[in-house]
Amino acid sequence: MQLNSSSFHPHHFTCDTTRYSEEQVACICEALSNDARKLSQFVWTVLERDEMRNNQYILKAQAFLAFHSNNFKELYRIIESHHFASEHHLPLQEWWLNAHYHEAEKIRGRQLGAVGKYRIRRKYPLPRTIWDGEETSYCFRDKSRVLLRDWYCRNSYPSPREKRELAEKTHLTVTQVSNWFKNRRQRDRAGVPEPKDCLKDISEEEDLKLIRKTASKLSNSFHNPSDLSSYSAAAAAATFPGFYMNYNDMMIGAGTSYQSL
């Protein structure tokens, strides 16, 4: 049954919704996913049916509405109290993480950088209700990275079939491949500089390793810790091109701009 949001009128949702099967309810929820007002009306009408209260599409729709209304406490409650099928995991994972990012940004009064987001993910790991337990690796093997970069240079939007082929070639999961392409496109849209040959791609964990390695080198370079503050950005950049650290305020930067941890 093919449905779209233009097929519905708010008055439809006040009628007898018992005529909708679970499959039809799922289709309607998907069709209304871009119209929060109509989706909300439909969900609360369907919830009058007791058997629909644990319907995964209805629960997912409730989570969607909670996320987009910034009702993060309700979002977390829905996610943590219901086990979702794997087909729903990806959007629920994104809402979970983005909600925690948003809360952290509101408290800090600034946007989170890559390192800040990494720390939030460590602090608020995905619940097992929306995660199959498989570790997500941000440190892919060099061969895998080369294959992904090469493909991205030719096509930044691979099809589902192409993603499966890439997953087999790189020994990654389809989800990891999808996330890699999504993150790379986001970096490009944000204007993060990349070499023309698409060969530069430093992951978040690699950034952290580089930061720790830089800190270790700097601390070993001086007998007097106070000398660290006088160590120039140019000297740090010479050791690790593209990065510098200011130990007075623990700011990390790349190029001509920097962001605080």
Curated annotation (Swiss-Prot):
GO terms for cellular component: nucleus; transcription regulator complex. One of its GO terms (biological process) is regulation of transcription by RNA polymerase II. SUPFAM superfamilies: Homeodomain-like. Keywords: Developmental protein, DNA-binding, Homeobox, Nucleus. The keyword DNA-binding applies. Residues 133-192 bind DNA. Pfam families: Homeodomain, SIX1_SD. It is found in: Nucleus. Coiled coil: none annotated. GO terms for molecular function: DNA-binding transcription factor activity; DNA-binding transcription factor activity, RNA polymerase II-specific; RNA polymerase II cis-regulatory region sequence-specific DNA binding. SMART domains: HOX. Belongs to the SIX/Sine oculis homeobox family. This is Homeobox protein ceh-33. It comes from Caenorhabditis elegans. The lineage of its organism: Eukaryota, Metazoa, Ecdysozoa, Nematoda, Chromadorea. The gene is ceh-33.
